Design a protein with these regions (language model features):
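Generic structural signal for well-ordered, non-membrane alpha-helical segments
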Residues: 1-4, 8, 25-29, 50-54, ...
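Cofactor-binding active-site loop characterized by glycine-rich and histidine/acidic residues
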Residues: 12-138
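Glycine/aspartate-rich loop-and-adjacent alpha/beta segment that forms the canonical ThDP
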Residues: 165-213
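Residues that form generic nucleotide/phosphate-binding pockets
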Residues: 10, 14, 60, 205-212
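Conserved thiamine diphosphate
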Residues: 142-177
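N-terminal capping segment at the start of a domain
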Residues: 2-20, 148
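Short acidic, glycine/serine/threonine-rich loops at helix termini
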Residues: 58-61, 127-129, 155-159, 184-190
Length: 213
């Protein structure tokens, strides 16, 4: 529990210090990325397809590998670039593309398990469905596709039950994570994608996280 709070505080700090948006998105996916890394074998790789969660990935990389998250922010900005030395295995940001790289890496090395995280809004991209179809039709067993189902796309809400039904029809063992972008009073709905924290927001967020301890 304490480690979980420290990770959230670090993510909050990174967003505030760097005046970065996508706060709600990053908090919705933080636990997923953390949980995946906690269970990965030494040779496994993680690919973040929804690149706007870059800050969440940096915080988790810092936790597990001791690589400074602020250094990753300075080097990559909000969306990660390929940097295998620092545990970033694919450039992402253009939605729907990194999952195709994940499929390729899984096919290229069956001895490795590839974990890839996509977002619900990202499922508007045709390459997502092509990738899921390919995984299923070719029975690729060493790739795990995770979906951050926070219910909010770039400009509108997501029909979650309908999307889950469609995703599972393409890939029955796809892993759905039901999350939310509304982690603090200043993060609500679509605005949680684009809100940039003020000092008051940051202090309120720290207070709420301290109360969770």
């Amino acid at each position: 529990m304490k480690e979980d709070i420290l990770l959230k505080k670090r993510l909050l700090e990174l967003h505030y210090k760097n005046k970065e948006e996508h706060v709600g998105s990053c908090f919705s996916g933080l636990h997923i990325i953390d949980k995946i890394h906690s269970s990965m074998e030494e040779n496994d790789i993680f690919i973040l397809s929804c690149g706007h969660l870059g800050y969440a990935l940096y915080a988790v990389i810092e936790k597990y590998y001791g690589i400074d998250a602020q250094m990753l922010v300075d080097k990559h900005g909000g969306h990660p670039h390929l940097d295998e030395k620092n545990k970033i295995f694919c450039s992402s940001g253009s939605l729907g593309l990194a999952i195709t790289v994940a499929v390729g890496r899984a096919v290229a090395d069956p001895a490795k398990t590839v974990h890839v995280l996509i977002s619900d809004g990202e499922s508007a991209e045709g390459t997502v469905w092509e990738s899921l179809r390919f995984i299923y039709e070719h029975n690729i067993r060493n790739i795990k596709v995770h979906v951050n189902m926070n219910g909010v796309a770039a400009y509108d809400a997501v029909d979650v039950p309908y999307l889950v039904k469609r995703l599972k029809s393409f890939l029955p063992d796809i892993i759905i994570h039901n999350t939310t972008v509304s982690h603090f009073p200043f993060l609500r709905g679509i605005n949680a994608h684009y809100h940039i924290m003020s000092k008051e927001d940051y202090e309120l967020g720290l207070k709420e996280l301290s109360n969770e301890c």
